[in-house]
Design a protein with these regions (language model features):
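Glycine-rich beta-alpha loop elements in corrinoid/cobalamin-binding modules
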Residues: 29, 38-158
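A structural signal for short coil/turn segments at secondary-structure junctions
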Residues: 34, 88, 111, 230-231, ...
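Short amphipathic alpha-helix
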Residues: 21-28, 223
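Glycine- and acidic-residue-enriched helix-capping/strand-helix junction motifs
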Residues: 11-23
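Conserved beta-strand positions
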Residues: 6, 67, 95, 119, ...
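N-terminal [4Fe-4S]-dependent radical SAM core
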Residues: 5, 142, 147-188
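Hydrophobic/aromatic residues located in beta-strands of well-ordered beta-sheets
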Residues: 4, 42, 93, 142, ...
Length: 274
């Protein structure tokens, strides 16, 4: 069994911390690929910043390390991965997330401990990397990645979300974390992906001026119920423009309020606007 560790370090806000949503998306999709999944074992994701030495030690025999990279965790993630490579040089370290640059000429000179950098949506790419890892570890046919030796063509954006399982409805987010007394969890939530705009001072993300794709109403309503049933206090909506689908997004807002009034959760909903 191939051991997979992962990190998505976050900050604690008022005794709350984000679920490792991005890692859960990847693990959930890999789990649907039966011929691949049976060979890989996902360990708990590292999210807390105060256990770094222990986290490094836990990776001394890991085969693959997935690191979800954002501006707020870049320094600790690179430090962590560098130390893992020192004690476990055979570990394949894969970086992905919004912090990975598209122009990567000097990236591997500065971060030589990284083996593969993933560009864009990671679900299909990670699955393809795992498939190549099982076969011959030749990644030249995996789209959407860079190594120190090559960059492959971009991976096409995912058009059909039906095959992407919910990290909440499958409880994947719970599978990847240790519950800690006194700590509650923040749920990152996507109702769609993409953004039709190209604002000069955008601080949302890199998928601007792209076709928008959305999840089904049924799934989103069930996820809202899951948030309430699991007493999730804070929803961090990752959409670029919540409300752009006016009729549907109003229904989601009404559903959020209904669950709050009935069950007491979620308590806060944060989103982005154009």
């Amino acid at each position: 069994m191939i051991k997979v560790n992962s990190s998505q370090f976050n900050h604690i806000y008022n005794n709350r911390i984000h679920f490792p949503y991005s890692i859960a998306l990847l693990a959930g999709y890999v789990k649907t690929q039966k011929n691949i999944h049976k060979h890989f074992r996902f360990e708990k994701t590292f999210v807390f910043r105060d256990n770094l030495d222990s986290n490094i030690e836990q990776c001394k025999d890991t085969d693959i390390l997935l690191c979800s990279c954002y501006v707020w965790n870049w320094q600790i993630t690179t430090r962590f991965a560098k130390e893992v490579k020192k004690i476990n040089p055979e570990c394949t370290i894969i970086f992905g997330g919004p912090q990975i640059p598209n122009h990567i000429e000097d990236f591997f000179k500065e971060y030589p401990f990284v083996d593969i950098a993933v560009h864009g949506e990671g679900e299909f790419i990670i699955s393809n990397i795992f498939e190549a890892y099982l076969k011959d570890r030749n990644y030249t046919n995996v789209n959407g990645i860079s190594t120190k030796d090559f960059t492959t063509p971009p991976q096409k954006r995912i058009e059909n979300f039906e095959n992407l399982p919910s990290p909440y409805l499958t409880n994947m987010v719970w599978d990847l974390v240790d519950r800690v007394d006194g700590i509650s969890w923040i749920a990152s939530w996507e109702t769609n992906r993409g953004c039709p705009y190209l604002c000069t001072f955008c601080d949302w993300g890199s998928a601007t001026a792209t076709k928008m794709r959305k999840w089904t109403d049924e799934r989103l309503f069930k996820e809202i119920e899951w948030f309430a049933d699991n007493k999730i206090p804070y929803i961090d909506c990752c959409d670029a423009n919540f409300g752009i689908y006016q009729a549907r997004d109003k229904q989601l807002a009404v559903k959020l309020k209904e669950e709050k009034l009935k069950k007491g959760y979620p308590q806060t909903f944060r989103t982005n606007w154009a």
